[in-house]
From Swiss-Prot:
UniProt name for this protein: Probable cation-transporting ATPase C1672.11c
GO biological process, one term: intracellular calcium ion homeostasis
Chief location: membrane
Pfam families per the UniProt record, alphabetical: Cation_ATPase, E1-E2_ATPase, P5-ATPase
EC numbers for this chain: 7.2.2.-
Transmembrane segments: 140-161, 168-190, 325-347, 351-369, 532-551, 565-586, 1073-1091, 1100-1117, 1136-1159, 1181-1203, 1217-1236, 1254-1274
Substrates-to-products reaction catalysed: ATP + H2O = ADP + phosphate + H(+)
Record's keyword annotation contains Translocase: yes
Amino acid sequence: MASPKMIRSKRSTSSIASKNSLNSYLASSLMSHDSIFDGPGLGTSIPSSVSSFHHQTLRPSSDASVSQFSMDYLQSEYNLNRYNDGESIAASRDYQSLLRDNGSGVYSDEEEITEMMLEELNIHPVLRRESVGEAAGLSEDGCCQILYLVEEDLEVGIAGYKTNKSRYRLYQAICLLTLGLAYLIFRWLPKYFIRFVGTREPLATADWLTIETQWGELSKLDIQIQPYENSLSSIFGASIRVAAPEGTENDPFIENFRYVNYRYMKLIFHPLLDRFLIQQDWKDPRWIRDTSVVKEGLERDAINDRLCIFGENLIDLELKSVSQLLIDEVLHPFYIFQVFSIILWSMDSYYYYAICILIISVVSILGSLIETRKTLRRMREMSRFTCPVRVYRDGFWTSISSTDLVIGDVFEISDPELTIFPADALLLSGDCIVNESMLTGESIPVSKIPATDQSMKELFSFSKNIPASLCKHFLFSGTKIIQVRKPFVNEKEEGASLAMVVRTGFNTTKGALVRSMIFPKPTNFSFYRDSFRFITAMFIIALIGFVFSSINLLTLGVPIATIIIRALDLITIVVPPALPATLTIGTTFAISRLRKQGIFCISPQRVNVSGKLDLISFDKTGTLTEDGLDIMGVSVIEGSELGDLRSNSGNLCSKDLLSNDSPSNLLYTMATCHMLRYVDGELVGDPLDIKMFKFTHWSYSEENFLNKKMSSEQAEDAAYVRTQQLIPPTVSPPWNSPSNNYTESDLELGIVRTFEFVSQLRRMAVIVKHGKFKKMDAYVKGAPEIMPSICKPESFPANYQEVLDYYTHNGFRVIACASKQLENCTWAKAQRMKREQVECDLDFCGFIVFENKLKSTTATVIRELNDARIRTVMCTGDNVLTSICVGKRCGMLPEDGYVFLPRFDEESESADEASRQLVWQAIENNEIFLDPHTLRPNVDFADHEPVSIELARLKDFHIALTGDVFRWLVDYAPLNVFHHILLKAQIFARMSPSEKNELVSCFQNLNYCVGFCGDGANDCGALKAADVGISLSEAEASVAAPFTSKWFEITCVLDVIKDGRAALVTSFSCFQYMALYSAIQFITVSILYTTNSNLGDFQFLFIDLVIILPIAVFMGRSRPYHRLAHKRPTANLVSKRILSPLIGQIVLICIIQYITLRIVRREPWYIPPPANSSDTNITNSDVTALFLISCFQYIFIGVVLSIGPPYREKVWRNYSFTAVVVVLLILTVKLIRLQNHKNFFMKLFQLTPTSKSFQNFLIFAGVIYYLLAASGQNYIFISMTNFISHLNNRLLNRRTKVSKKLYKRLFADLQNEQV
């Protein structure tokens, strides 16, 4: 890194984010050893770089998702006032104005630029210096602050500390005196270490910081000091304007700055604000000027400054050394507990068992170490990307490594060796086509065009969320370059395509994706929370057993030391160290199965959540229906009405090229109004646009033919083209000339200007030049609903709505086209025209009609989801009538059911927004309406026969909403009415990306566990907001969703749900099995302790390694059941459905072991334990009988808990598990049949001889136990619990239990009202 110099430029820049496509192995990397103890995680944060596809809102809670935390904890912990707007200063949308004092300046040589910037962006000061503390969540003593990290959707508390030397020395002494035990405790409980050795200190003078998230994750970071001799404003840029206290300089010269690196984000201390800020909103004042200024590049001093502030442009994950990984692994509580257990067993003379467990632990540590190291290295290799780039610095072009790029650097993207963007950048010249599938899941290539002067101002003004208008110029780090077109300079020379770096390193989109992988958010899924509560309860039981065993052994005269060892041994039995690891068994197998089916998961904890889905929302086009629509034909105006469909484009074009008739304009619209590009000899772009263009049979060219022919006759236009370096594509008809003698260039249409499709506007437009004529036209295509607002009323045919309704009712997709002549429009004027000027006063041309085919699997999947009582809804940007038709064809709506479509009452149009009225009219019958207040059908059945059929159909009506109505309902409808609508609405059409996101949140507010399946950039926000998002994309890992399917079929939804349910059931089964295994062994050992006996060394080994380990692993390999059941599996570990059978099984285990003990003691060959012996007794009939019968219990309880249908296949279909059970049963019977006390295995297992009749009894008792355990698990225990619960409710006169889910309660209320 270059050292800073004394004299530096005061220009500023900004930092942002880079992102690369990570492969499917990332899923397994999240399953690393530590994760099973650190708790579940989920990478759900969305980088700001793609937030233009995402409505930035905080997610509401749902049963399965991370509930939005209350800041009460952080406020109380750090004694802070939370800022009012929910964002820190660094995150505020008014970031540029928050701290600017009226009339005070910060810059000297940049004052004019900054004032112009603030004036043009209409930015006004909001807070003065004295209000900074409250606004920023700063404590009164300056020791703490709260910071909202928008990209991570994370709010953290930051506190400053200094080390108290005397208490630190005391801490060291305590660690020595306790032989390291205190060190381990403080290591596992870092809060207590911080409170013990640290003293609160203002952030300005602190030596180290603690940063704590709302999830309780704590980090201790040393403050670094970076030498830096320059002004403060050069670090924080023009974004922050601070009014300094009287008598102090508001832009001081500093010699160094203080910072910490938190999760690969740099937090720099601002001395005037007394708080740490993230360097992600840094803006260069030059960006407010035009692009020509930016193209001048940077000077050496500015480069050194920015390297110093932002660091290298490199995503370099810290790779821990082998010794660090080994220490972290060995000092984990799991292995410390193992070491404690091994020492304990050795002291109790269980040497063989202790040695085996030690070997297994060492192998496990080494295996985990190797796997973790390999995973980290692979992730580092894939996230780390460097390449040579040509950059313009100090007035010269030079080649440097991409790691040396800094914000503001101008580099060439047309370099053939550049295939992936090394940083987030803004396109300055030329255009390009990129693949952004790893960001949005959108498999369609995206076109990028050069930024304008207005774009530069928008770049300066945006904070965290990149506006949609800027995305067309924005090049995201890690995205692949498909094609780059160089700008036009002259007929013999092409220019270079240039881009300016905007964000570097971990601040890029790629960096945000990597961070979301390595720092996943915890999920609030109740299973994980309950499982650790259950472990705590088992530990308490172990303590109770400890006390009773100690008292019993004491009465038998056993030495105190032996009593302590034996009693502590009970704790290792009741709380087996491997118990937490069983939580991941089902998830691991599920992820492996999904990967084989082409479904990749970057968030393993979402697998179990998918098993609880209540509602799935689908996008339509490309998800439910085919992406590549077939064009049916076009309908053009004939006279005063729209005519029949024309399936051939040959008769649309007039022989007079200057004519302005409807058919010709429709043809020109289809030929030009698109964003297609040629890549490797093939057209790429939106499939709908490709179908539309191919229908015209015109040809597309990017060879600049038009520009070469125009210079002689249109000098002004030619000069402008060369100045602006424009390369417009051209399209040509399939014939050489109609009937007139036109040259080839006369027939060309040059696409002079393109206004790309915007979801909110639902249209796109182009400005087109006709050959060598001066004639220029504007052509627009978009949703039919928006045409009345941009077209002349008199241009619409009389049957406009009738024709539109006909096609949409029948499921066709309709695109409307319009055009107008641009009078006296030159090329230069066309480039300066605003979109509003082009898209107004248009003449309607006609309709393009596409056939909206369902995908072959859509109807089957929807039917299976409906059969499983998983609600399905459609959320699309398409026409509402088309969507309703598709919904009926796929089974989302009943074919003969009523669908009501609300629209705004025309009489209330003039009223204020909140007072507008909705008219709820049935699509199938214009005479049937819903009452706007009760949402009940309001119809007179006098004319409708038969009445019973009409009533039945109306009782089960559904609702379809459009985006504008949905927005009004969210803002103004009464909550109870809105909830009622959400319960009945199945179709949501004309929804913008932000409205899709908000719809998911609304469903989550009703306690639905929501899934969303989509395929494009418009779905990105909804995919992230949903509890389970499934993106249909070719990319293996996408930031768009936790799940990515490379197959463009919604069958992946069924696969995810089935495997999620199977994984959830497997997790419960494995956990219950480990719990009952502990219970069986605890009961056995507790009974034996009454006679100072215990199991033998190899008996413990046989149970733990030969029986338990294979069963626990292989019982999780059961595949999901082929059909979805109506009822979802429970996710509550402490529910009666789980606890009742568990308690019943424990009682049954006790009874079987007690009966076995009573019978063996009555046998004439019974060998009792030695009386009054202080040594451990192993070789006696009590131990032999209980060991053998418990072996059957370990095996059979595994079979009982290996649940089959309706969530998993039948247990015998799990062939590996079946084989293990059979082998173990054979081994157990063999041990029972041993007779000769001289037999090797008799001696090894320290067994005593038994009679033939008793052996038969043990086998019979094992079979009886299995039958009782199986029937009890499946029928008896639950039935008994339900009966007792019902009887208790009757006696206490309690009401029936009310569902915790709001939507279920609302449905019940609706049914009661209908009755």
